[in-house]
């Protein structure tokens, strides 16, 4: 009886792959069930990730959020913020340039020297009090952020978004993603990807900071 029961569990599905009334490549029910489970898992795993929000657009209002204050006192003074945390509206100046970046993002490293040049130009053109620059490193730890600053890769302050909270609020943009914000959190300009022409970008910042 046990043998007959075992044979019953492995009934051959003869309606699949028939040729001339004879079975071709017989498939057992347990195998079909397994294939069904695998297909279901694949449909879930391969589905595109859902974004929590849309990317910020020009003239939209940025959702409220806080960031950990930079550990270096010189960066705190530059931004005009104090530990433990601050909101974008707390930053000194009229215009805040926010760069969403990744610690291991190749395009971010491509943009870094361009933005360092932009940072220097802002200081030289006496815009330093009106325009501030801030990098937000998504998924980064304190150690990784401190390494970025100490290595000289970034001359402006970088803070971490270790748990991706801000990244999700902003619609999970690819990196780098740049925003120009007003004091009250209004989005003045956005750019997804590397800003290669700093000479063309700088006049826009000047105009917004008047």
Regions found by a protein language model. Name each.
Residues 46-78:
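N-proximal helix/coil linker or "cap" segments that precede and/or mark the start of modular domains
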Residues 92, 100-117:
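Conserved redox-active cysteine motifs that mediate thiol-disulfide chemistry
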Residues 109-152, 165-167:
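Structural microenvironment flanking redox-active thiols in thiol-disulfide oxidoreductases
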Residues 4-22:
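Short, Lys/Arg-enriched N-terminal segments with co-localized hydrophobic residues
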Residues 148-154, 162-205:
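Thiol/disulfide oxidoreductase modules built on the thioredoxin-like
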């Amino acid at each position: 009886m046990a043998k007959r029961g075992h044979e019953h569990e492995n009934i051959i599905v003869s309606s699949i792959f028939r040729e001339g009334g004879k079975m071709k490549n017989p498939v057992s029910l347990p195998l079909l069930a397994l294939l069904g489970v695998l297909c279901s898992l694949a449909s879930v795993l391969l589905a595109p990730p859902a974004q929590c929000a849309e990317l910020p657009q020009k003239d939209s209002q940025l959702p409220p959020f806080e960031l950990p204050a930079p550990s270096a006192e010189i960066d705190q003074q530059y931004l005009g913020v104090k530990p433990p945390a601050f909101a974008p509206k707390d930053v000194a100046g009229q215009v805040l340039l926010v760069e969403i970046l990744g610690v291991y993002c190749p395009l971010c490293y491509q943009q870094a020297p361009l933005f360092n040049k932009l940072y220097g130009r802002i200081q030289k053109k006496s815009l330093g009090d009106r325009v501030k620059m801030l990098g937000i490193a998504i998924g980064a730890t304190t150690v990784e952020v401190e390494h970025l600053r100490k290595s000289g890769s970034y001359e402006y302050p970088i803070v971490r978004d270790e748990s991706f909270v801000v990244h999700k609020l902003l619609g999970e943009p690819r990196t780098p993603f740049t925003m120009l914000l007003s004091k009250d959190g209004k989005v003045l300009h956005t750019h997804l990807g590397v800003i290669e022409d700093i000479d063309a970008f700088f006049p826009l910042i000047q105009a917004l900071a008047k």
